Amino acid sequence: MDDASERAIEEDMLDQFNYFDDEDEELIDRREPAPLDSFDLVDEEPDEDEGESAEPSQSSRLDSLLSRAPMHHGVRAGALHMKTDWHQIVTAGDELAVDAPLTDKSSIICRTGMLMLASGTGAWRVRDTMNRVADVLGVTIHVDLSLLSFECTCIEDGHCFNEVVSLPTTGVNTHRIWMMESFLKEIETYGRRFTVHEYHEMLKTVESSKPDYAPWQQGLAAACACGAFVFLLGGGPIEMACAFVGAGVGNFARSHILKQGLGQFSALTTGVALACVSYLLALLGLGQVIPGAMSHQEGYIGAMLFVIPGFPLITAGLDIAKLDMRSGIERLSYAVSIIVMATLVGWMVAECVGLAPDDFAPLGLSPLALTLLRVVMSFVGVFGFSVMFNSPVKMAAAAGLIGAVSNTLRLTLVDAPTMIPFLGLSTGMPPEAAAFIGALVSGLLASLAEVKLTYPRIALTVPSIVIMVPGLYLYRSMYYMCTFDTVNMLGWFVRAVLIVAFLPVGLGVARTLTDPRWRHTS
């Protein structure tokens, strides 16, 4: 066979793979690539008779191309996380969910887990919720969870489907946790009667729910909580009033910035800086009418305690207790990063304006008066933190009552020689052991309240012990580190770490004693 015949055969074979219609005039030019000359990058040598009318050289053409303004092809830089339209990925929306394809069942399960994870609850509760929904739908699932994402593998009748869900940010929303608990109870009772679209409509209602409180209400809640926190740390009326102003302004700014969709650390640093400055301005104002008010500078620490990440700190410990190491370590890292950033900003502002974390002056109250005030301030503090976590008023009040009992007990055990003098004790209980007992009591009381009030246990336990997180110790450790006082830094840091470690241990023991689902590994 000669060369001409071989070329003819090759052309016939290529024509068989031509996917374009020869009669389509719009696509004619696409079938054959244009020659390199058409891109005008290769310069032909000009004729001698053209002289100065010859085209510019190749180098000048390249220079002109490089000097042009950048071309835009309709691609815009958007958010790092795209929103999923769950209704668009459903293939059998009007079919009963139990009879739907595996992909539709996976969308229901993953959307349920996404809403739970976005609410700030721990990995065990997210997995448990997804497992219970999967059980209703007749699917076996395996879930690997982290702070902002999870991977879910669904198995049914020899088929396997894998799905990954990612969140743009994290936060705490106890009202949404409560709504998801109600959704779960509804599903376990009537779930086999719902279609795929009905599942997604219920989940859409939960997802589209607005926060219960405006930024100014969040600021007021932080003001009340931090003012009460300052009293529990040993502060007096002047420190409480200034912390009220500082925390209110700081958390209002922080909530407003977060509402605009900006980053958490931008909101955090702005809120802490404004809280410290507002505390000083309030102190200067009081100094005009109250002699000696400027000597009460140490309360500025209380004005910034609204940023202490109590929820991720506690849930990190609970995740680690259930061997959800990936989620636990990520939550712990997130909490530590917030603490470090907040304390560094607080230290920087304190250095600029001349504030220092000194000890509070004794209040001189009797044991009975101090105990009663601790009960009231513990309730106010826990109630305020619960509102910051978006708890409804009744839920926040229930958490406040639990915190009033457990936190007052903790403080009384630490100050036992002065609070209970008739026992004749020489020393009080170590703060670490008292924190364990306080968390244990909170967990046991929350178990009783969960039965009576149907509130999620975590929405009662965590706010009730957030007030036990040693924010003062954490700040002082970072303050002394920045001033290169290593001895004091290590002392306050070790104290803070031990107390923080014992808080989730106490909750875990209470959960083990009262919840069989938590008690077992499977």
Where on the chain are the PLM-derived regions?
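Short juxtamembrane and helix-loop transition motifs at transmembrane-helix boundaries
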Residues: 197-210, 223-235, 254-262, 353-367, ...
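Core mid-bundle transmembrane helix pairs that form the ion/substrate translocation pathway
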Residues: 269, 297-303, 314, 327-383
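Soluble N-terminal domains of membrane-associated systems
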Residues: 1-197
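Core alpha-helical transmembrane segments of integral membrane proteins
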Residues: 211-316, 386-389, 393
